[in-house]
Regions:
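N-terminus-centered regions that define maturation/targeting leaders and the start
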Residues: 1-125
Length: 125
């Protein structure tokens, strides 16, 4: 379970193997209320209509809102996709939906009290 002092969650998906020199953010959703323990199918849609009340998405590194699926360049090898759930001790991050995922991460520093990461892999030949 989550730490007792959890006030909200942030969910991220990051590909550290993208050929950008800095990886690729596929999804960031933040300000998920602490009483939420799952996201519904379709939660990563661009309009965010099935996200829990109060939750917000940032643009991914393709400049789009919503989850962007795995699509490594053909022949580039195996890419890791790190799905993380961050437990925060604040109900809301002091950011707006126009900031980058890096700024979100900076604002989570000092408020993250727990984290779980599941890493999947995908390769396109």
């Amino acid at each position: 379970g989550a730490p007792e002092e959890t006030a909200s969650y942030t969910v991220t998906c990051f590909d550290p193997d993208a050929p950008t020199g800095s990886g690729f953010w596929h999804w960031v959703v933040y300000d998920i209320p602490a009483d939420i323990n799952e996201l519904t199918t379709g939660a990563g849609s661009q309009d965010g209509s099935t996200l829990p009340a109060g939750a917000k998405q940032l643009k991914n590194d393709a400049g789009l809102f919503g989850y962007l699926g795995s699509a490594p360049p053909a022949g580039h090898g195996v890419h890791r996709y790190m799905f993380a759930v961050h437990a925060l001790n604040v109900a809301s991050l002091p950011i707006t939906e126009d900031v980058s995922p890096a700024i979100c991460g900076f604002n989570m520093f000092g408020t993250t009290i727990g984290r779980a990461i599941v890493t999947s892999v995908y390769e396109q030949n």
